[in-house]
């Protein structure tokens, strides 16, 4: 079963890193179940967004899991997200509070989510509504801004003309 995961807005201007958080989630998934990570993605969102922190990027991945593991994947993601919320609750106060969102889709998501999010401002309320209508599973808290990047990360479709950015951190 092909699954798309997207994560955005787990970082603060002074601490945290969405890329590192996403890597922790993918490692946890790999340790708990038999899966193949087919593709990792970095989505650079519209650079003029009001709520951007540092790099204004969201992370995504496409993984293959056994159909019998669909509920296990949801449980792993739910438990991980609960721990993430505890972690980000300890971040210092900020004018731009974190707004973590983790998106899971077992179907293709509307590709315009990606194109809209990289080309201009997208109202989080609209994506939240659309995601609910497509069957995407969303983990979020009170602030919903992270839904834009998380959904953009699950909706991009690569093709033969796509380019890739190599990411490394230590």
Functional labels for PLM-detected ranges:
Residues 3-170:
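Conserved mixed alpha/beta catalytic, RNA-binding, or beta-rich assembly cores of soluble enzyme
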């Amino acid at each position: 079963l092909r699954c798309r995961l997207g994560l955005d807005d787990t970082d603060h201007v002074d601490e945290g890193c969405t890329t590192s958080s996403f890597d922790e989630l993918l490692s946890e998934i790999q340790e708990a179940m038999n899966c193949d990570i087919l593709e990792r993605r970095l989505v650079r969102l519209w650079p003029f967004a009001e709520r951007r922190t540092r790099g204004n990027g969201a992370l995504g991945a496409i993984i293959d899991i056994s159909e019998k593991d669909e509920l296990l994947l949801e449980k792993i993601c739910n438990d991980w997200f609960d721990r993430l919320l505890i972690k980000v609750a300890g971040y210092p106060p900020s004018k731009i509070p974190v707004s973590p969102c983790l998106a899971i889709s077992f179907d293709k998501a509307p590709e315009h989510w990606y194109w809209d999010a990289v080309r201009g401002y997208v109202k989080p309320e609209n994506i939240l509504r659309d995601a609910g209508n497509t069957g995407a599973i969303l983990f979020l808290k009170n602030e919903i801004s992270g839904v834009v990047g998380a959904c953009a990360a699950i909706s991009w479709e690569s093709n033969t003309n796509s380019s890739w950015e190599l990411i490394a951190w230590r």
